[in-house]
Design a protein with these regions (language model features):
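Flexible assembly/topogenesis modules
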Residues: 1-238
Length: 238
């Protein structure tokens, strides 16, 4: 078994792995409380092509020179981690401190889940709603990104859909040839995420920038209070 998020170390440079998934209807959560249900997922077709190549001799010599000089090595692999934070009920504005501390990620994505989604099989844990979120921003080493919080807008109130635009711009839309398949309707009703690409050229770390250290806090403002606690599901890519 291979972690798909860590396959960059196994494939040649400039090789892209594309996985196309067909979204199932929301009535099919692949979870059930029926002990007699013997469901399974069957892969009908899968293929992968790999080619080998020999780098130019000048590149090999350059690597040897850099190693002899003791230059810092940049290893081309990606590490992904997932963290959970609890949001208490009855708040209109809150800060999730220390989402990430120490070595900072070049990308992060945040989704919201309820207690029922985490603990009950009758609730689909793969449906991410806005949970009445109004605005958001992150504070990276004391600096707000963006300077003013992002107003996510809405579909019915004539909003500018700034949240959806921010999401698309921060998931690699300028480096990938395919789109996410998430429409504005999907974004607000079942696939709501807060996404951040911290690289200066919005390449999701494809150019192997030197990583920063520090702290990232998440600031949230809600339209109204909630009676029940919810959770943030934060994943980062290093």
């Amino acid at each position: 078994m291979v972690d798909l998020f860590n396959t960059e170390r196994y494939i040649p440079p400039y090789t892209e792995i594309i996985i196309e998934l067909e979204r199932a209807p929301v009535t099919l959560p692949l979870l059930s409380d029926l002990a007699s249900l013997n469901a399974k997922i069957q892969i009908m077709d899968i293929n992968m092509a790999v080619r080998r190549f020999t780098p130019h001799q000048s590149l090999i010599l350059d690597h040897e020179k850099r190693m002899k000089r003791g230059d810092r090595m940049i290893l081309p692999f990606t590490r992904t981690s997932v963290r959970y934070r609890t949001l208490h009920p009855g708040v209109l504005s809150t800060v999730v401190p220390g989402c990430f501390t120490g070595q900072l990620p070049y990308s992060m994505i945040v989704g919201f889940l309820t207690n029922e989604q985490l603990s009950e099989v009758t609730h689909n844990p793969f449906i991410f709603n806005t949970q009445n979120l109004k605005k958001f921003n992150v504070v990276k080493n004391g600096v707000s990104i963006p300077q003013d919080p992002v107003n996510i807008g809405d579909l019915t109130g004539g909003g500018a859909l700034l949240g959806y635009t921010h999401f698309i711009e921060n998931i690699g839309s300028n480096i990938f040839t395919h789109d996410s398949g998430i429409t504005p309707d999907d974004y607000f009703n079942r696939s709501f995420f807060i996404a951040y690409d911290f690289t200066p050229d919005k390449t999701l770390g494809a150019n192997n920038y030197e990583q920063e250290n520090g702290t990232i806090d998440l600031c949230l403002q809600f339209k109204k209070t909630d009676k029940y606690p919810s959770h943030t599901n934060s994943s980062r890519m290093l």
